[in-house]
Regions:
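Conserved A-loop
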Residues: 9
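Conserved active-site tyrosine of GNAT-family acetyltransferases
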Residues: 18-25, 89, 116
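Vicinal oxygen chelate
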Residues: 1-5, 29-77, 86-112, 123-132
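Short glycine-/small-residue motifs
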Residues: 118-121
Length: 132
């Protein structure tokens, strides 16, 4: 039935702060043409599309009735070299949420986007996770 994650929607208050972060700092390309007047931006992250959708103020209401508040707990980007990814993001002055964590399944470091959403840079231990 379910085959893979296709996209996620991140609700945000200030698209003008979020777009440069995901485009220039994280380095994700636009998946569709970006038009600020539309109130959203789509970025390609591997096989998953991340949509930033502006809410509040004059932005149109787009939330599903009964849905939780804007934002989400966290999401993760797999990287090949954690130290290199950390160094690259340090050069952009990102705000780190924690030091590197060594767990049985992942090595990761967490950071904040401009609206306080938590992103993780992860190096998964595919064998420990039971993945090929």
């Amino acid at each position: 039935m379910l085959r893979r994650l296709d996209n996620i929607d991140v609700l945000c208050a200030d698209l003008d702060r979020m777009v440069p972060f995901y485009r220039d700092v994280i380095g994700l390309p636009f998946v569709l043409p970006y038009d600020r007047g539309e109130g959203w931006a789509g970025f390609q992250a591997g096989d998953v599309t991340i949509f930033l959708i502006e809410v509040g103020g004059d932005a149109p209401t787009r939330r599903v009735p009964g849905a939780g508040p804007p934002g989400l707990e966290s999401f993760a980007f797999a990287v090949d070299d954690l130290a290199a990814a950390i160094a690259e993001l340090d050069a952009h002055g990102v705000t780190w949420a924690a030091d590197v964590v060594e767990s049985p399944w992942y090595r990761y470091r967490s950071l904040y986007d401009p609206e306080g959403n938590v992103l993780h840079l992860t190096v998964p231990d595919r064998k420990a996770l039971g993945l090929p």
